[in-house]
Amino acid sequence: MLTVISPAKRLDWDVATPAGATLPEFQDEAMALVDVARELDVADLRKLMGLSEKLAVLNLDRFASFAEQADTETARPAALAFAGDTYTGLEARSLSDDEMAYAQDHLRILSGLYGVLRPLDLIQAYRLEMGSRLATPRGKTLYDWWGDRIATALNRAAEATDGRLLVNCASQEYFGAVDLSALSVPVVTPVFLEDRDGTTKTVSFFAKKARGAMARFIVQNRVRNLDGLRDFETGGYRFVPDQSTETAPVFVRPYPEAAPAARELAS
């Protein structure tokens, strides 16, 4: 079983690089995208990703200083460096060495810049969202740039681990970069719902965290099939058979009443 998750906009560089760090498969592709991004100015980058001027300047500086060869001084392992709701659920820093080794083979992070990352692949600080309309020699968007490359990489990863199923815990924006016509393994996309007074809905903040928690559950329990996936109960979620399909298992929990109202945003 292979699981995919999205990256995060926020980064936390305050982490030591463990032994066994690896290099991204598409390092050359990433460098080519960096070269394209270096042609942009602050106004271009603000428009491209809806950034403030401060963030646009920061990320232009990141592209300018991007090194052709990542090392432990300038880069950090992807799963440990990304910081966001999904990574709060994943809690990669608390995985044991054995669990991280398993994740290295069975977990992939989709990325606008790097395409596909293993948890311990070294990344340099960047922000380039998959939905960005960055024009390249291959087309008008990053979806054009990546084409079937991401799907092909996932096929190789699945074959290497005898994976017969791909669990999609990524967002629509990122999983949209996977060319399904080129994918050789069936896809299952878990759905996470909150129940308030008998009405269920997806709440973006909670769903992102649950996707990360699902990825952690799969790694820690060496889940290999749908039956094992349905045992997920982290955070109070329960599998609901009558709302589920073979490709979209549904997990529901009571709405956390202490949740901040500002995060009640349906995805």
Curated annotation (Swiss-Prot):
It comes from the Bacteria. GO terms for cellular component: cytosol. It holds the Pfam family H2O2_YaaD. InterPro entries: YaaA. GO terms for biological process: response to hydroperoxide. Disulfide bonds: none annotated. Belongs to the UPF0246 family. HAMAP family: UPF0246 (MF_00652). NCBIfam families: PRK02101.1-3. This is UPF0246 protein Dshi_3333.
